[in-house]
Amino acid sequence: MSKKSVLITSLMLFSMFFGAGNLIFPPMLGLSAGTNYLPAILGFLATSVLLPVLAIIAVVLSGENVKDMASRGGKIFGLVFPIAAYLSIGAFYALPRTGAVSYSTAVGVDNALYSGLFNFVFFAVALALSWNPNGIADKLGKWLTPALLTLIVVLVVLSVAKLDGTPGEPSSAYAQQPAGAGLLEGYMTMDAIAALAFGIVVISAFKYQKVNKVRTATVVSAFIAGILLALVYLGLGSIGQVVNGEFADGTAILNYAALSTMGQAGRIMFVAILILACMTTAVGLISATSEFFNSLLPGVKYHVWATVFALISFGVATMGLDTVLAVAAPVISFIYPSAITLVFLSLIEPLLFRLKWTYLFGIWTAVVWALFMSIPALNPFIEWAPLHSMSLGWVVPVLVASAIGLAIDWNKKGAQSVAKKESISV
């Protein structure tokens, strides 16, 4: 297992995770949490870093892609879930969002023609960079990610050194339950779904590099990428700790920090950071979705899928960020409970045994609960659940359902063991 290959692939994975949302969430958390920053950021890291890392490991333990994982939930779930996951974080949401966010920050003019031209160039470059799936690790890991990290480090160091703001009183939820608020904020990045998708890219990269222990290398890369994410989040969060005033979001905080410390050059650097973050994520998403659908329908080549997804993303992004969010956010919210359930069941399975009924009970409870959460008219039927107000009402029902399934699996295993012993004695 080459250390160089692992490092380059780790940098690639970091850059694919680190999109626009990952850039702007931590500074706002740093500002809002105030003096309660430490528990808030630790909660944030638990769901925005640890959960995606565990998702990558779950993919490795289950096979080579999310379809191998999802098959444990039955044939229907095994087909529908991965398709929904790849489309929602791909061409119908996260992918066009990379272009829309880049345009709104870099240009910010409400003009359909300008938006169309910008997004055309953006997705043309992303398509070109993802055209050869075997070369993505080098393009992202060797060049784009080091450039992105360098710019982020410069912004963080100058901001912390030059800005003289002090942490204020924690606002809203951060005053009462800072760790819980941070946990929920990290949960809302929904990076666990992206992790399920990116697993196939990491595994393919190591296979192309002829790495012997692909599974081990993938797990190590996931941990290294996670450590990098955590360090960057801590740095960005610290910027929120040294600014004072009212800011609409993390973008405004970072823009202020860049202008205050470096003037107009800082503004240019911030735009470069955001576009690089969005571009590396776009390349990863095009590659991941195209590889998955190529494996699903081998008759349609990777390059055809890549072109189709880039064109769809261009069209959706040109319609604007609000359109992207309105269309895809409900879908993401619907499949996320199932994704997390799938990840944790895949992680505990090697410690126990084949969990047929545990998977079926747990996953389908998550699906049904998410359906009730997605339809406002059905919400009154589930408001009694613990954590419902935090959009986590599905957690306890899924745990109970999984425990029932585990009891059935355990009972069946015991019955099979008895039957086997009796047949041997006869």
UniProtKB/Swiss-Prot annotation:
What does the record give as the function of this protein? Branched chain amino acid transport system, which transports isoleucine.
Q: From the Swiss-Prot or TrEMBL record, state where the protein is found.
A: Cell membrane
Q: Does Transmembrane helix appear among the keywords?
A: yes
Which UniProt key words apply to this protein?
Answer: Amino-acid transport, Cell membrane, Membrane, Transmembrane, Transmembrane helix, Transport
Instruction: Provide the protein name.
Output: Branched-chain amino acid permease BrnQ
What protein family does this chain belong to? Belongs to the branched chain amino acid transporter family.
**Organism per entry:** Corynebacterium glutamicum (strain ATCC 13032 / DSM 20300 / JCM 1318 / BCRC 11384 / CCUG 27702 / LMG 3730 / NBRC 12168 / NCIMB 10025 / NRRL B-2784 / 534)
| Recorded phenotype for the gene knockout or disruption | Deletion mutant shows a considerably lower isoleucine uptake rate as compared to the wild-type strain.
GTP-binding as a keyword? Answer: no
The record's GO CC annotations read: plasma membrane
